[in-house]
Amino acid sequence: MSFEVFEKLESKVQQALDTITLLQMEIEELKEKNDALNQEVQGARESREALVRENEELKQEQSSWQERLRALLGKMEDVQ
């Protein structure tokens, strides 16, 4: 009878080891996915920052053109 108990215990230990191994593999896969997602987030963050800078530059350029246009309109009014 003790041999049967030993076999059951051995079987349960093996199942536990198999489960642990599978969970470790899953953890590694999730870590890799997490790293890939972190890189994707960093790339998106950098793209966003570049777009914000470009937007600011375009706003400044627009403001400059508006000032030039106002100056030209002012000169046209003076001529009339």
From Swiss-Prot:
Sorted alphabetically, which keywords does the UniProt record give?
Cell cycle, Cell division, Coiled coil, Cytoplasm, Septation
Which sequence ranges form a coiled-coil region, renumbered to this chain?
3-80
This chain's function reads:
Non-essential, abundant cell division factor that is required for proper Z-ring formation. It is recruited early to the divisome by direct interaction with FtsZ, stimulating Z-ring assembly and thereby promoting cell division earlier in the cell cycle. Its recruitment to the Z-ring requires functional FtsA or ZipA.
Q: How does it assemble?
A: Homodimer. The ends of the coiled-coil dimer bind to each other, forming polymers. Interacts with FtsZ.
Q: Which Gene3D superfamilies match?
A: 1.20.5.340
Identify the coding gene: zapB
Keyword match tRNA-binding: no
Major location, coarse class?
Answer: cytoplasm
Organism the protein comes from: Proteus mirabilis (strain HI4320)
Protein name as catalogued = Cell division protein ZapB
Among InterPro entries, the record links this protein to: Cell_div_ZapB
Q: Which GO terms describe its cellular component?
A: cytoplasm
Q: Please give the superkingdom of this protein's source.
A: Bacteria
Cell cycle among keywords = yes
Q: What are the subcellular locations of this protein?
A: Cytoplasm
One of the protein's GO biological processes: FtsZ-dependent cytokinesis
Protein family according to the UniProt entry: Belongs to the ZapB family.
